[in-house]
UniProtKB/Swiss-Prot annotation:
InterPro entries: Aldolase_TIM (IPR013785), TAL/FSA (IPR001585), Transaldolase_3B (IPR022999), Transaldolase_3B/F6P_aldolase (IPR004731), Transaldolase_AS (IPR018225), TSA/FSA_arc/bac (IPR033919). It is an enzyme of class 2 (transferase). It is found in: Cytoplasm. Pathway: Carbohydrate degradation; pentose phosphate pathway; D-glyceraldehyde 3-phosphate and beta-D-fructose 6-phosphate from D-ribose 5-phosphate and D-xylulose 5-phosphate (non-oxidative stage): step 2/3. Its main location: cytoplasm. This is Probable transaldolase. The lineage of its organism: Bacteria, Bacillati, Bacillota, Clostridia, Eubacteriales. Transaldolase is important for the balance of metabolites in the pentose-phosphate pathway. Keywords: Cytoplasm, Pentose shunt, Schiff base, Transferase. The gene is tal. Belongs to the transaldolase family. Type 3B subfamily. It catalyses: D-sedoheptulose 7-phosphate + D-glyceraldehyde 3-phosphate = D-erythrose 4-phosphate + beta-D-fructose 6-phosphate. CDD domains: Transaldolase_FSA.
């Protein structure tokens, strides 16, 4: 399972990219708004930092405007993937962008039906939001498992991105289920690195070394 960071913060992306495992970045309008920077300029900057897919979401909600905005964002860098919200207009836009050779990421996916439709429309990726499904009292990991099983059953080429990751165990479960990718917030990645026994072991090694020398 590949690891993406879900962030639009340049310093966060630089830090995590420096660890050597980062394979891509996902952004959304909320994350971009926090940075208070020019949208296209920010996507361009991220694209120069990370050698992998960079998801940039359209703001428009009608098909023609989505396609136009998607083409503009895709022109920033070859690695830019256009995030399209799952709706009727979005499915039309996904199909149109596919015909133009532009990669898409169907976002705000909350059912296996939605994921299947997006894949058949031509989405390069689908992003089920497991944490938000959990928030409704349902099981987001069951949704992820359903999508992975259906795609495996029919050899669907669309890749699955486990999104709305809330804690490290979401990552472990996503990997066990067989998700192609997990896109993970900065703070959760930091939690994944840490373990109290690792910290205690490092502290003991350093203490023993100082005593010996």
């Amino acid at each position: 399972m590949r690891i993406f960071i879900d962030s639009a913060n340049i310093e966060e992306i630089k830090e995590i990219n420096g660890m050597g495992f980062l394979a891509g970045v996902t952004t959304n309008p909320s994350l971009v708004a926090k940075e208070k920077k020019d949208y296209k300029g920010l996507i361009r900057e991220i694209s120069m930092l990370v050698d992998g897919p960079i998801s940039a979401e359209v703001i428009a909600l009608d098909y023609q405007a989505m396609v136009q905005e998607g083409e503009e964002l895709a022109s920033i860098h070859p690695n830019v993937v256009i995030k399209i919200p799952l709706c009727e207009e979005g499915l039309k836009a996904i199909h149109a962008l596919k015909q133009k050779g532009i990669a898409t990421n169907a976002t705000l996916v909350f059912s296996a039906n939605q994921a299947l439709l997006a894949a058949r429309a031509g989405a390069s990726y689908v992003s089920p939001f497991i944490g938000r499904v959990d928030d409704t009292g349902n099981d987001g990991l069951t949704l992820l498992d359903d999508i992975v099983q259906i795609f495996d059953q029919y050899m669907v080429e669309t890749e699955v991105i486990a999104a709305s990751i809330r804690h490290p165990m979401h990552v472990v479960a996503s990997a066990k289920i067989g998700s192609n990718i997990a896109t993970i917030p900065y703070q959760v990645i930091k939690q994944m690195v840490k373990h109290p026994l690792s910290d205690a072991g490092i502290e003991k090694f350093m203490s023993d070394w100082k005593k010996a020398f």
